[in-house]
Each structure stands twice: as C-alpha cells, then as structure tokens.
Amino acid sequence: MIARSLPLQRLARKFCLVVSLTSILVHFGGANGLYAAQAQQPFAAFNLKVEIDIEDGEVEVWADFTLGAGSNGLDLPNESVSLEVKGGTGAYSVAIPAGSFKKDGSGRFTFQGTIDRVKLEASIRPLRDGAFEFEVETEGANLKGFANPVTVNLTIGDDGGSR
C-alpha cells in the first residue's frame, strides 16, 4: 500500500489540507480495516482540499480528478463512492451505495442523506475529457483523535486516488 500523508496547518479548530498533483501512481486497499474499497485504476491527476472541524463533526472535501488511461469511466448508477479521511487516532469513512447519486439537468450527480447517523451532501460533476469535480460535506461525524498528518482516500467504482 502506498499512501502519502501530508502535514496540515491548524487554523483555529480546523485542519486544512491542500494538495496539487499532476500524476499519481497508487494502489490502495483496506490495510487498516477502515477502507474496504479498492481502486484498480488510479486517477491520472488528483487535486484536493480538506477542512475538518472536530468540534462540530464536519468534514469538507473538494477535489478534482482525471480518470487514468485504463479507466472504463464512471457509472454512478452502478458504482459506489467511498471516502476515508484519517489522521492521528481519528478516522472518518463512508461508503455511498451505488445508485444513490441522482443526476440533475446540468449533468451533476448529487446525494443528500444520512449514513451511519452522519448527514451528508455530496456531488460529482463532469468537467471535460475524463475530468471531474467531487465535493462532500458532513455534519455530526465523530472526529475525536484527529491530528496531523492526515491521509485521504477516494474511490469511485474501480477508480481512485489517495493522498
């Protein structure tokens, strides 16, 4: 498993992570038992920003990514979306089941709901030529124990990235 942990800068009671990558060669899985999804096709590019508010149980992730050359594309009606954010002794992970995202008139896929007592709002929007934008915001997650450095894993179907 290759996963790169990046230091964070503490801003009040929030952690903030900004990552800009042009290429990623990663294969990851459930080595720690928290992350069950396994990406077989690494993202070709993965840019990421994360904010964590421990006291309010909020995790916000903004990412844009480009599918790798071997990808068969995204099929959200038939593929689940898994996200894991961990650091220190804290971890938050969620799997949004296949078919949960609904497509709107602009081509954006959105999900609003509650999973494991945590409120979630998520969206995936196609940009251009295999590039996508991903956003998620949680409310009410147990984020006790979070500390630097933080690692983020995102998997959509068999495509994914880790930082």
Regions found by a protein language model. Give the residues of each.
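Generic preference for hydrophobic/aromatic residues in regular secondary structure cores
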Residues: 1, 29, 50-52
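Bacterial N-terminal signal peptides
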Residues: 14-30
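N-terminal secretory signal peptides that target proteins for export/translocation
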Residues: 1-12
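Extracellular glycoprotein-like low-complexity segments
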Residues: 35-163
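Short, intrinsically disordered, low-complexity terminal segments
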Residues: 9, 28, 33-36
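A composition/secondary-structure signal for short, hydrophobic, low-basic-content segments
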Residues: 5, 23, 34-36
